[in-house]
Amino acid sequence: GIMSIVKDVAKNAAKEAAKGALSTLSCKLAKTC
């Protein structure tokens, strides 16, 4: 139902946020920002 849709959206948002944070962190470490 609605709850599983909300859960999926939240999971995807968390995944995207983690990806963004990871790429920001790695570019800072590599000084390529």
Curated annotation (Swiss-Prot):
It is found in: Secreted. GO terms for biological process: defense response to bacterium. It comes from the Eukaryota. One of its GO terms (cellular component) is extracellular region. The keyword Metal-binding does not apply. Disulfide bonds join 27-33. Expressed by the skin glands. Its main location: secreted. Keywords: Amphibian defense peptide, Antibiotic, Antimicrobial, Disulfide bond, Secreted. Has a non-hemolytic activity. Has a broad spectrum of activity against both Gram-positive and Gram-negative bacteria, fungi and protozoa. Monomer. Belongs to the frog skin active peptide (FSAP) family. Brevinin subfamily. This is Gaegurin-2. The gene is GGN2.
